[in-house]
């Protein structure tokens, strides 16, 4: 691929912008300065600009630690979109592989690979999602069994699929809940059906992808290849 085309795709730059960047002498390919846009980037070649490696053009897979009060959409009339937390080119090409409510925190996956995100969000694939939940009222002894059997939700014809509930801290009304569906406000509705209320909700895991504990709310990083591939397993 031509160097100017590589930079256009990787940085979201125009051809004119890419040419200017190249002529600045700050672009290196495999450690050597290249000042021609027609230079062919070899397969597996490492491109650097301004001292930083420029990722090869291709699908993007991002893990975001979503804070509260951000929405998982491109536009909203009341709250800021979580996309403003990304310092990335062509954000308009990205989408969420499963959303979180505005007041829910934790793991959100963002990509421009529609097939990959479909694997996560399609009900037929039963992708597991794990949430840490803090409840308003005491955890009842029969909760674990009831979640394992499925919960009857209001205005739903069928009960939820079996879910796994783990009691983490009974004194703090803290549990871990793993579900394989993505119904509207599902976690909150499941506990409401049992007469309880979710006070705080935090997603920790999607499939085999776990929220990086080095990230702070609002931080993000690219997924490793192993994390990307885990979705297909």
Swiss-Prot record:
CDD domains given in the database record: PseudoU_synth_RsuA (cd02553), S4 (cd00165)
GO biological process, any: enzyme-directed rRNA pseudouridine synthesis
Molecular function in Gene Ontology: 16S rRNA pseudouridine(516) synthase activity; RNA binding
Positions of the catalytic residues: 101
Keywords assigned: Isomerase, RNA-binding, rRNA processing
Entry coiled-coil feature ranges: none
Name of one Pfam family that matches: S4
Start and end residues of each S4 RNA-binding domain: 1-67
EC number(s) recorded for this UniProt protein: 5.4.99.19
Catalytic activity entry: uridine(516) in 16S rRNA = pseudouridine(516) in 16S rRNA
Superkingdom of origin: Bacteria
Keyword rRNA processing annotated: yes
Function: Responsible for synthesis of pseudouridine from uracil-516 in 16S ribosomal RNA.
Family classification: Belongs to the pseudouridine synthase RsuA family.
PANTHER family: PSEUDOURIDINE SYNTHASE, PSEUDOURIDINE SYNTHASE FAMILY PROTEIN-RELATED
Designated name of the protein: Ribosomal small subunit pseudouridine synthase A
Taxonomic source organism: Vibrio parahaemolyticus serotype O3:K6 (strain RIMD 2210633)
């Amino acid at each position: 691929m031509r160097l100017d085309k590589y930079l256009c795709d990787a940085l979201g730059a125009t051809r004119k912008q890419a040419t200017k960047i190249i002529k600045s002498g700050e672009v290196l390919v495999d450690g050597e300065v290249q000042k021609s846009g027609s230079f062919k980037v070899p397969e597996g070649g490492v491109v650097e600009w301004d001292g930083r490696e420029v990722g090869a053009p291709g699908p993007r897979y991002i893990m975001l630690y979503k804070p509260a009060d951000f929405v998982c959409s491109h536009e909203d009339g009341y709250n800021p979109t979580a996309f403003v937390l990304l310092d990335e080119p062509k954000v308009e090409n990205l989408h969420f592989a499963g959303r979180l409510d505005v007041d829910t925190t934790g793991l959100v996956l963002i990509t421009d690979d529609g097939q990959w995100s479909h694997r996560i969000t399609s009900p037929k694939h039963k992708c597991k999602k794990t949430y840490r939940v803090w409840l308003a009222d005491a955890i009842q002894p029969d909760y674990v069994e009831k979640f394992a059997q499925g919960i009857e939700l209001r205005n739903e014809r069928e009960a939820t699929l079996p879910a796994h509930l783990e009691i983490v801290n009974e004194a703090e009304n803290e549990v871990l809940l793993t579900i394989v569906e993505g119904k509207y406000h599902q976690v909150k509705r499941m506990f409401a059906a049992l007469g309880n209320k979710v006070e705080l909700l935090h997603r920790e895991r999607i499939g085999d992808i776990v929220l990086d504990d080095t990230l702070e709310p609002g931080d993000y990083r690219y997924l490793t290849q192993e994390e990307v591939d885990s979705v297909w397993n």
